């Protein structure tokens, strides 16, 4: 019984610690609203990008639900985003052209123009003072990898400012959605293992351990 109580106290302490580190729901929703607004601007009917049906979606910690609070008040939340343009092919466009297309559309909005940082190596960055900054990564489909199916069906080709402006057949690759799916599948097995370990530590059956008490890394 004493062992279970100690485990319970430790679990509550860890839960509180994780909650203190986590991004507040209000901030999360605010960031989501802002990047959805960016996506709406990129895809407006009058936008030159509208024919490519721009899609903005999060990648990295924001897509995995692992965003943590900035260390100090001077730091900001980092929101990594993909700007996917459908229909564009590496055979008919260059990385420089893709990067410029997205950047020009952002600059056409007076608000975003003021928020834009200097062009990054792979991203366009919008700086929301004392809140967060959004790194927007232009991307197109990686047809060769997607043809292999599975997690690779989400593969992307991305831009790199260090690449030449010509239609280089070798593009940097990325697969944020595939990674999220892989991560979640791995978490399922980790969850089951942690639940079993917790049950063993308190000499209880697995079914006696509530799911909410199991915190995956």
Give residue spans per PLM region.
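Alpha-helical structural motif
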Residues: 34, 98, 213-217
């Amino acid at each position: 019984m004493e062992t279970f109580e100690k485990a319970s106290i430790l679990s509550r302490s860890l839960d509180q610690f994780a909650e203190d580190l986590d991004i507040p729901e209000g901030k999360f929703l605010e960031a989501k609203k802002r990047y959805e607004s960016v996506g709406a601007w990129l895809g407006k009917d009058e936008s030159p990008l509208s024919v490519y049906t721009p899609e903005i979606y999060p990648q990295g910690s924001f897509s995995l639900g692992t965003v943590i609070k900035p260390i100090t008040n001077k730091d900001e939340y980092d929101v990594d985003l993909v700007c996917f343009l459908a229909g564009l092919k590496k055979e008919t466009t260059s990385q420089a052209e893709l990067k410029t297309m997205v950047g020009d559309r952002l600059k056409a909005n007076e608000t975003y123009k003021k928020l834009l940082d200097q062009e990054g190596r792979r991203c366009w960055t919008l700086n929301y003072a004392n809140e967060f900054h959004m790194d927007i990564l232009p991307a197109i489909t990686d047809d060769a990898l997607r043809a292999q199916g599975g997690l690779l069906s989400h593969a992307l080709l991305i831009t790199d400012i260090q690449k030449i402006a010509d239609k280089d057949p070798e593009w940097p690759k990325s697969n944020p959605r595939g990674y999220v799916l892989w991560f979640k599948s791995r978490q399922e097995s980790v969850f089951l293992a942690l639940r079993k370990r917790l049950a063993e530590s308190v000499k209880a059956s697995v079914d006696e351990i509530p799911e909410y008490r199991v915190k995956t890394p």
